[in-house]
Amino acid sequence: MAACATHSSLMLAYAAASTRSQDLTPTPSLFSFASSRPNHLSFPLLLLGGSRDRRCAAIDRASNHKFIVSAVAAEADLDTEEDLEQTATAVLDPPKPKKGKAALVLKRDRTRSKRFLEIQKLRETKKEYDVNTAISLLKQTANTRFVESVEAHFRLNIDPKYNDQQLRATVSLPKGTGQTVIVAVLAQGEKVDEAKSAGADIVGSDDLIEQIKGGFMEFDKLIASPDMMVKVAGLGKILGPRGLMPNPKAGTVTANIPQAIEEFKKGKVEFRADKTGIVHIPFGKVNFTEEDLLINFLAAVKSVETNKPKGAKGVYWKSAHICSSMGPSIKLNIREMIDFKPPTAN
């Protein structure tokens, strides 16, 4: 009888617990033990008033069912942990790279040619060279199959967005530019004959203006007489972006057309500071002698110094470099460059 009493108390406690957990019954999608048959967990409550044997049998069935439910619940917890581990592993796995068109190589990642790397060893990157050494080194670094141009690049302490700090001028290179310059002239009346006599390659008036509007650009310099500027003004959108618009500061608007033609044929070069305050001036070819390159370079330096803008303040020269078309830049010592005096002939 004591055993049955013990079983009865256990049965009541378990029946109460199973009654509270009815809402937590696993769904059929996760567990396979759920069925449509009546739930036996509540059955012992109906047998409380029956005989001893029937009560004991009910207790045994409830106990066995409890063990089954516990085992299934433990298995469900294990499956849930495995699912969580798989989810965490999927999150930690790095995403696979997307397949598509390869990205362009950045400029800093591009490799230089073997030729450039070899000639780059001839000069030290941060060293400032004197003018004579720099020009000699420049000729050594020019080893392409064509005749390269030689250029000077001066960084000035100016801001061209202000009118009093703009720089635009010309320089006559004593030894020429090393290339043939095709000069076109817009003139009328007797100026036409003067231009032809002075060696102009193309001479015209209204007819030449119409050709330019139609896309004719077979010339390097365009010179115009002052009386033609009213008609030339309409060509600004065509000539301006190409740097061919006649301008008094560039010496391409003048009444003395023969002199202008002669100067440009001999090597007169126009230059101007870009928006960052840098001036780019070509001063010859690599097949020039070192002496001729030196003379042209000093003429360019003198012109930049002479045409210093009125609004320039502080130190005017910030840096100076020279280079060939396909070669590395060579940094110059600015103080030595400005104070340099060519040797006098004996």
Curated annotation (Swiss-Prot):
GO molecular function, one term: mRNA binding
Keyword match Ribonucleoprotein: yes
Organism from which the protein derives: Arabidopsis thaliana (Mouse-ear cress)
PTM sites of type Phosphotyrosine: 129
UniProt protein name: Large ribosomal subunit protein uL1c
Family the entry assigns: Belongs to the universal ribosomal protein uL1 family.
One of the protein's GO biological processes: translation
Superkingdom assignment: Eukaryota
Keyword Hydrolase in annotation: no
Modified residue annotations for Phosphoserine: 197
GO cellular component labels: chloroplast; chloroplast envelope; chloroplast stroma; chloroplast thylakoid membrane; cytosol; large ribosomal subunit; nucleus
Signal peptide feature range: none
Primary residence: plastid
List of residues that carry Phosphothreonine: 177
Family annotation (Pfam families): Ribosomal_L1 (PF00687)
Assembly, per entry: Part of the 50S ribosomal subunit.
